[in-house]
């Protein structure tokens, strides 16, 4: 029987201490096992900012899977990769596995204001 892995993104409204910055993610991304999932994070000129991605499974704390746009922490599989350009940052998960089912959050670090959103 075929099954589908559901990768959920959330609509994020992030507020800094001085200005507001809105990040938009799709409500959900659904792919078949073995295929490639791409989860986007949209924001005005997001390519000029540093983007981090977190994976959160039910009942667990978030886990950092990509930082500074495209770097992976130790222990995160190479199947997880990131890119960031223009108004869109993207988390790509290659060869999706059942264990990848989770919520995925993007976080932006604006170096000009020196605090996260």
Swiss-Prot record:
<dbReference type="GO" id="GO:0019814">
    <property type="term" value="C:immunoglobulin complex"/>
</dbReference>
<dbReference type="InterPro" id="IPR013106">
    <property type="entry name" value="Ig_V-set"/>
</dbReference>
<feature type="region of interest" description="Complementarity-determining-2">
    <location>
        <begin position="68"/>
        <end position="70"/>
    </location>
</feature>
<keyword id="KW-1015">Disulfide bond</keyword>
<dbReference type="Pfam" id="PF07686">
    <property type="entry name" value="V-set"/>
</dbReference>
<comment type="function">
    <text>V region of the variable domain of immunoglobulin light chains that participates in the antigen recognition. Immunoglobulins, also known as antibodies, are membrane-bound or secreted glycoproteins produced by B lymphocytes. In the recognition phase of humoral immunity, the membrane-bound immunoglobulins serve as receptors which, upon binding of a specific antigen, trigger the clonal expansion and differentiation of B lymphocytes into immunoglobulins-secreting plasma cells.</text>
</comment>
<dbReference type="GO" id="GO:0003823">
    <property type="term" value="F:antigen binding"/>
</dbReference>
<dbReference type="GO" id="GO:0005576">
    <property type="term" value="C:extracellular region"/>
</dbReference>
<feature type="region of interest" description="Complementarity-determining-3">
    <location>
        <begin position="107"/>
        <end position="117"/>
    </location>
</feature>
<comment type="subunit">
    <text>Immunoglobulins are composed of two identical heavy chains and two identical light chains; disulfide-linked.</text>
</comment>
<feature type="region of interest" description="Framework-2">
    <location>
        <begin position="51"/>
        <end position="67"/>
    </location>
</feature>
<dbReference type="GO" id="GO:0072562">
    <property type="term" value="C:blood microparticle"/>
</dbReference>
<dbReference type="InterPro" id="IPR013783">
    <property type="entry name" value="Ig-like_fold"/>
</dbReference>
<keyword id="KW-1280">Immunoglobulin</keyword>
<keyword id="KW-0732">Signal</keyword>
<feature type="domain" description="Ig-like">
    <location>
        <begin position="18"/>
        <end position="117"/>
    </location>
</feature>
<keyword id="KW-0472">Membrane</keyword>
<feature type="region of interest" description="Framework-1">
    <location>
        <begin position="20"/>
        <end position="41"/>
    </location>
</feature>
<feature type="region of interest" description="Complementarity-determining-1">
    <location>
        <begin position="42"/>
        <end position="50"/>
    </location>
</feature>
<keyword id="KW-0964">Secreted</keyword>
<dbReference type="GO" id="GO:0070062">
    <property type="term" value="C:extracellular exosome"/>
</dbReference>
<dbReference type="InterPro" id="IPR003599">
    <property type="entry name" value="Ig_sub"/>
</dbReference>
<keyword id="KW-0391">Immunity</keyword>
<dbReference type="InterPro" id="IPR036179">
    <property type="entry name" value="Ig-like_dom_sf"/>
</dbReference>
<keyword id="KW-0393">Immunoglobulin domain</keyword>
<feature type="signal peptide">
    <location>
        <begin position="1"/>
        <end position="17"/>
    </location>
</feature>
<keyword id="KW-1003">Cell membrane</keyword>
<dbReference type="GO" id="GO:0006955">
    <property type="term" value="P:immune response"/>
</dbReference>
<dbReference type="InterPro" id="IPR050150">
    <property type="entry name" value="IgV_Light_Chain"/>
</dbReference>
<dbReference type="GO" id="GO:0005886">
    <property type="term" value="C:plasma membrane"/>
</dbReference>
<dbReference type="GO" id="GO:0002250">
    <property type="term" value="P:adaptive immune response"/>
</dbReference>
<dbReference type="InterPro" id="IPR007110">
    <property type="entry name" value="Ig-like_dom"/>
</dbReference>
<feature type="disulfide bond">
    <location>
        <begin position="41"/>
        <end position="106"/>
    </location>
</feature>
<keyword id="KW-1064">Adaptive immunity</keyword>
<feature type="region of interest" description="Framework-3">
    <location>
        <begin position="71"/>
        <end position="106"/>
    </location>
</feature>
<protein>
    <recommendedName>
        <fullName>Immunoglobulin lambda variable 3-21</fullName>
    </recommendedName>
</protein>
């Amino acid at each position: 029987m075929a099954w589908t892995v559901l990768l959920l993104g959330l609509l994020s409204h992030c507020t800094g201490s001085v200005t507001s910055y809105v990040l938009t993610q799709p409500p959900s991304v659904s792919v078949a096992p073995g295929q490639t999932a791409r989860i986007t994070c949209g924001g005005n000129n997001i390519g000029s900012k540093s983007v981090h991605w977190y994976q959160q499974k039910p009942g667990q704390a978030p886990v950092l899977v990509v930082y500074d746009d495209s770097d992976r922490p130790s222990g995160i599989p190479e199947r997880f990769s990131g890119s960031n350009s223009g108004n869109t940052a993207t988390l790509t998960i290659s060869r999706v596995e059942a264990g990848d089912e989770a919520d995925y959050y993007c976080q932006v670090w604006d170096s000009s204001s020196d605090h996260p959103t």
